[in-house]
Swiss-Prot record:
It is found in: Cytoplasm. Pfam families: TACO1_YebC_N (PF20772), Transcrip_reg (PF01709). PANTHER family: TRANSCRIPTIONAL REGULATORY PROTEIN YEBC-RELATED (PTHR12532:SF6), TRANSLATIONAL ACTIVATOR OF CYTOCHROME C OXIDASE 1 (PTHR12532). One of its GO terms (biological process) is regulation of DNA-templated transcription. Transmembrane segments: none annotated. This is Probable transcriptional regulatory protein tll0175. One of its GO terms (molecular function) is DNA binding. Keywords: Cytoplasm, DNA-binding, Transcription, Transcription regulation. It comes from the Bacteria. The keyword Transcription regulation applies.
Amino acid sequence: MAGHSKWANIKRQKARVDAQKGKIFARLSRAIIIAARHGGGDPAGNFQLRSAIEKAKAAGIPSENIERAIAKGTGTLDSDAPLEAIRYEGYGPGGVAFLIEALTDNRNRTAADLRAAFNKQGGNLGETGCVGWMFEQWGIVTVTAPRDEEAFLEALLAADVETYEILEEVAEVRCPVPALETVSETLKEHGYTVLDTESRWIPMNTVEITDEDTARRVLKLMDALENLDDIQSVATNVTMSDALMEAMYV
C-alpha cells in the first residue's frame, strides 16, 4: 500500500512538471513567432530572434519545433489566429503595481483570465497607463559571476555601461534595450559567458510589504499570473524583507 501511495505521488509530481514544461515550451515558442514576425526569420540579422532561439534550445525545445515557430512568424507556414503582444497593468494587494506582458491570440480571454486572478487576491486589473509610468524598461545581460571585479569593470566600460549587480553565481548588467546585442557581444569578446539577455521592466520606486497576509496574497497573485498560458513576464514594484519572504515558504 505504501508503495502504491509513493507511486501515485511520483505520478502527480511528474504531471505537474510535464504541465509546467509544456507551458514553458509554449511561452518560448510564442516569443520566437513574434521575434520572427517583427525582424525576419534569419537569426544572424535578428538579435531578438537569436536570443529567443537560444532560450528555447536551453529549455530543450526540439529543433523542428523552433523551425516551425520561425515559419509561423514569417508567414511561410499556416498558423492559427495571429498572436499579438499586449501589456496589461493593475494593482495587487497592498497597492503593489503589476505590469504584465502577454502574447495572445484572444485578448478577451486573456483579459478575463487576468481579471479573475487579480480579483481572487483582492487586486484589480486597471486601464492601460495606470502603473506603466512607475516602471522603466531596461536591457539585462546576465553573465557568469566575474572572478576579478576590476577586469569586469573594464569590460563594462568597453561596452559603455556602468550599472551592474553581482549576485551569488551571476552578474546582471543593465543597459538600454537597443544596446543589448552590442553589450552582449562586447562581454563575450572580453571572455565572459553570457547566460541570458532580456528586456525587463524595473520599478523606479518600490512598495514595501511588512505583514504576512498581504505578502502571501501578493506572491499568490504573482504565481497565478505567471502560470497563465498567455503571459510572458510579470513585473511588480513590491519589496519585502528576507525574513518575511522565507516565512511565506515555510
